[in-house]
Each structure stands twice: as structure tokens, then as C-alpha cells.
Amino acid sequence: MTNIRIGQGYDVHQLTEGRKLILGGVEIPFEKGLLGHSDADALLHAVTDALLGAAGLGDIGSHFPDTAAEFKDADSRVLLRAAYQSVQAQGWQAVNVDTTVIAQKPKLAPHIPQMRANIAADLGIDISCVNIKGKTNEKLGYLGRMEGIEAQAAVLLVRI
């Protein structure tokens, strides 16, 4: 049995009026928010998928289905912590998390330190082990037209 595993996660949500924009557990001032059953935090959903995938535990939808009433407007930090408990129960510990958020607007740089701190706290790892990169799509495609925000994540796990 291998003692290290890597997981990859991805999520995208449509931007819409009348919703809060939450990324990495941080409410970001913006005229639109992400549409989804939960708080639609695409960054935390990608991290959650990466963790579950690395541990061989499926994906976020199999653990927290968007058809279940108990997850309506759920805080994605709560979902991340619950998923990570399942990962730890299988004997795995997160080593590091590397993510990319693609959003034409708003600028994410001012919010990245708090996003990193939230993920580090939720996983019980040092903030130096969490990286978040904000990118635009150079005005190309649906992301460039500000129709949505996309997030990608990679997670390294080690056997406890």
C-alpha cells in the first residue's frame, strides 16, 4: 500500500444577482454571487473534491448531495471539515493544498490571505502549506464574460 496520494478537484458555479460571493470561506464584496444549493463556494468545493478523491472516497456530490434539504445554503467550511474527518478516518493526513481560482472579477488578491487561513485551520495544517492563485481568463469564454467562477485544487495526503 502506498503512503502518499494526490487528489485533484474542480468546481465551477454560475454568477448571479441576489447571492453572496463566498470563496475560501470569505465573503467578498461584489454585485453578484455564486449560484448553488449550498453557499456555492467553488474553491472549498474543489478542495473537498481533491481530498475525497485522494482518499478514494468519491466526490462532494456523493457525500453532500444537492438534492438533500439539509445541505441547502450549507456553509462549505462545515462540509470541508466533515469530508476531512472522513479522510482522516481512513488514515490520511493533508500535507499541502495548491489551488487556482479563475475569475475575471472581482480581484481576489486582497482576500487570499484569509482564504488560506480558513483552509489551513479547517485542515489543521500550517498556512504555509496552503496556496491560492487568482487568475483571470483574459476576457475569454464564459469566465471572461463574468458568467461564472471556476476553481481547481490539488491535495497531497500522507498515511498517518
From Swiss-Prot:
Pathway: Isoprenoid biosynthesis; isopentenyl diphosphate biosynthesis via DXP pathway; isopentenyl diphosphate from 1-deoxy-D-xylulose 5-phosphate: step 4/6. InterPro entries: MECDP_synthase, MECDP_synthase_CS, MECDP_synthase_sf. Binds 1 divalent metal cation per subunit. GO terms for molecular function: 2-C-methyl-D-erythritol 2,4-cyclodiphosphate synthase activity; metal ion binding. Its EC number is 4.6.1.12. Its cofactor is a divalent metal cation. Keywords: Isoprene biosynthesis, Lyase, Metal-binding. It catalyses: 4-CDP-2-C-methyl-D-erythritol 2-phosphate = 2-C-methyl-D-erythritol 2,4-cyclic diphosphate + CMP. The record marks H37, T136 as: Transition state stabilizer. GO terms for biological process: isopentenyl diphosphate biosynthetic process, methylerythritol 4-phosphate pathway; terpenoid biosynthetic process. A divalent metal cation binds at D11, H13, H45. It is an enzyme of class 4 (lyase). The keyword Kinase does not apply. 4-CDP-2-C-methyl-D-erythritol 2-phosphate binds at D11, V12, H13, H37, S38, D59, I60, G61, R145. It comes from the Bacteria. Homotrimer. PANTHER family: 2-C-METHYL-D-ERYTHRITOL 2,4-CYCLODIPHOSPHATE SYNTHASE, CHLOROPLASTIC. Belongs to the IspF family. Involved in the biosynthesis of isopentenyl diphosphate (IPP) and dimethylallyl diphosphate (DMAPP), two major building blocks of isoprenoid compounds. Catalyzes the conversion of 4-diphosphocytidyl-2-C-methyl-D-erythritol 2-phosphate (CDP-ME2P) to 2-C-methyl-D-erythritol 2,4-cyclodiphosphate (ME-CPP) with a corresponding release of cytidine 5-monophosphate (CMP). This is 2-C-methyl-D-erythritol 2,4-cyclodiphosphate synthase.
